[in-house]
Amino acid sequence: MLLHGTAGSAADLAQAAFFEALYGAEEPLDLSRYFLVIPDAIGAGDSSKPSDGLHTHFPHYGYKDQVRAQRLLLERVGIKHLKLVLGTTMGGMQTWLWGEMFSNDMDCLVAIASTPAAISGRNMMWREMISQAIRSDPAWKNGDYPKDPPSKNWIKTAIPLSAIMTGSAEQLQKQAPSRETAIDLVDELEASGEAYDANDFLYAFESSADYDPAPGLSR
């Protein structure tokens, strides 16, 4: 089972680059040998989410809820044991939770760009800044805004911050090697933010509040 990152979806793991590097013949996750399950997390892709209509009346969920939902999905399709759980960023953190919550259900865990510890420090500061950017936007209206709000001021802060949070310094330097390209990149990121729903984005980042697998990993 492969788990996507924060504010992403299963579609992120179905891009051509993954087929070339991971899913092709003789590659680590060769599709002719393995059955891959790539679910949309709660609040992402085609899964249920606030923007379906409930707005902030949608139940708040955490990473543990997402892991339980993933396990229920496996039960529904008749999969009793996994060869591998692999995830990146948010998916990596959920991978650690799989190890804590359902340690007998898989042979191997691969948690990428994540650590088995509660979110704190710089990572938590970024998340709080993203949440505050959304909650302080007048157009957010406590989460009860029209489908197409007149403005999305929150994306000017939240989307570039999200890119800094999830991208490496080396990657961002390659994308923006000069002053001009850095400014252009910020503009591009803001433009891409128009595709996001404020409540969906807020819920996704705040869902990490229950994440702390460390105490249970030694069991």
Model-derived segments and their meaning:
Residues 20-24, 93, 147-148:
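Short alpha-helical segments and helix-capping/turn motifs at coil-helix boundaries
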Residues 190-219:
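Conserved serine/cysteine hydrolase catalytic core
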Residues 1-52:
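N-terminal cap/lid subdomain of alpha/beta-hydrolase-fold enzymes
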Residues 85-87, 112:
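Short beta-strand immediately N-terminal to the catalytic nucleophile in serine-hydrolase-like folds
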Residues 53-65:
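Catalytic nucleophile-loop/oxyanion-hole region of alpha/beta-hydrolase
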Residues 105, 111-189:
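Alpha/beta-hydrolase-fold enzymes
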Residues 64-84, 93-96, 101:
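Conserved acidic catalytic loop of the alpha/beta-hydrolase fold
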Residues 4, 87-89:
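Conserved alpha/beta-hydrolase "nucleophile elbow" surrounding the catalytic nucleophile
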